[in-house]
Amino acid sequence: MDKQLRYAIALTGSIGSGKSTFVSLLSLYGYQSICADSIAHKVLEEHSAEVIAYFGNEILQSDNTINRKVLGNIIFASSSKREELQAILHPHIQKAILTQAQQLEEKKVWYFIDIPLFFEVGGKEAYPVARSLVIYTPKAKAIERIMKRNNFTFEEAKARIDAQMPIENKCRLADDIINNEGDLRTLQHNAETYIQSLPCVDCVQSS
């Protein structure tokens, strides 16, 4: 199996940066994507027993399923607990992402892997993609979006952003950056410009 993901672009950024909106725009142009968050939700369900064993029954809802918001508040308040959850789940998340990616590699066209913690978990060492793309939004604007979207308090939104690598650091590590400080129309224009800048598939195949 060819482990190098020659047609994959890792899409990342801070929470509230607009990654999901960007993925929706990509789909309009026919680009496929893999969503790490969706995979993580499934993995959490499959390995809930391990998570409950570590965090205790306080994270359970009345139907004995995990209350994601309660769990989120716990891990975003404690780096050690956040790292423990990541240690439990990430190997399974990584395996699922790479399995899906290998299937998309067979199509020999560009596709995207939406991984919020791409750089935090090892970047191209963990996910050997062709390129990395950061969606940039200033911290203050990202907090504002999170508060509105998730009905979070300022403290809850800030805690989630502070738990991730600073967006400026991600920008320094990325191959490409798209600015999302403006409105949807501006983001769509930036998406179109980025897509047009991608090397042709034939160039990738011959490299």
Curated annotation (Swiss-Prot):
Compartments in which it is found: Cytoplasm
Organism name: Helicobacter hepaticus (strain ATCC 51449 / 3B1)
Name of the molecule in the record: Dephospho-CoA kinase
Pfam families membership: CoaE
Entry's EC annotation: 2.7.1.24
Pathway assigned to this chain's UniProt record: Cofactor biosynthesis; coenzyme A biosynthesis; CoA from (R)-pantothenate: step 5/5
Molecular functions per Gene Ontology: ATP binding; dephospho-CoA kinase activity
Gene3D superfamilies tied to this protein: P-loop containing nucleotide triphosphate hydrolases
